[in-house]
């Protein structure tokens, strides 16, 4: 029970396909690091981004999201405008065990540049790519490097099974692929 180690993460990813693709070692020379670490896994950001813009002139409404609020971008380096925001997704696809919750925290390399990464918890039973929220809090444009590390995931095993997993309740983001915009169940 509790916070899971590198050996547990490796075993679950190799044997149970918890993380696909899975980097068994920490990769860190010449890149923002990614792969397994002592008590976590550093995820990579893909090369597709949705950058928020004010060109459409609409209001951001999570209950009725207008796709005119974002511009699609694909490339090795994404420039997030000053005081702006982008969405991306992980390269990795997750298959969460029914008794494990994952929490994701931004990497210090980006945080020290004013880049804040937010990802909501990966609930027990969740399957899919992870949509990543990236905020540039600086007055300057900021680079995000595709196919490199963006955040660290910590895995926490519950003391007892939960009554209902994300899969059981057919969560609205279950089995998401690509960047998923806000959804409201109707």
From Swiss-Prot:
Pathway: Pyrimidine metabolism; dUMP biosynthesis; dUMP from dCTP (dUTP route): step 1/2. It comes from Campylobacter concisus (strain 13826). HAMAP family: dCTP_deaminase. Keywords: Hydrolase, Nucleotide metabolism, Nucleotide-binding. Catalyzes the deamination of dCTP to dUTP. GO terms for biological process: dUMP biosynthetic process; dUTP biosynthetic process; nucleobase-containing small molecule interconversion. Its EC number is 3.5.4.13. Transmembrane segments: none annotated. It catalyses: dCTP + H2O + H(+) = dUTP + NH4(+). It is an enzyme of class 3 (hydrolase). This is dCTP deaminase. The active site is at residue 133. Homotrimer. DCTP binds at residues 107-112, 152, 166, 176. Belongs to the dCTP deaminase family. One of its GO terms (molecular function) is dCTP deaminase activity.
């Amino acid at each position: 029970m509790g916070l899971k180690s590198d050996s547990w993460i490796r075993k679950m990813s190799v044997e149970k396909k918890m993380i696909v693709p899975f980097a068994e070692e920490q990769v860190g020379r010449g890149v923002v690091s990614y792969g397994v670490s002592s008590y976590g896994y550093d995820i990579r950001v893909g090369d597709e981004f949705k950058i928020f813009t004010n060109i459409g002139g609409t209001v951001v409404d999570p209950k009725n999201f207008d796709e005119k609020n974002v511009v699609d971008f694909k490339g090795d380096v994404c420039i997030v405008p000053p005081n702006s925001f982008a969405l991306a997704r992980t390269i990795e696809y997750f298959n969460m065990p029914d008794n494990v919750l994952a929490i994701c925290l931004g990497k210090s390399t980006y945080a020290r540049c004013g880049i804040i990464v937010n990802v909501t918890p990966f609930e027990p039973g969740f399957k899919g790519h992870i949509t990543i929220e990236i905020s540039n809090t600086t007055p300057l444009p900021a680079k995000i490097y595709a196919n490199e590390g963006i955040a660290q995931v910590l895995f926490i095993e519950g003391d007892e099974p939960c009554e209902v997993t994300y899969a059981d309740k057919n969560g609205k983001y279950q089995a998401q692929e690509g960047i998923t915009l806000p959804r409201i169940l109707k």
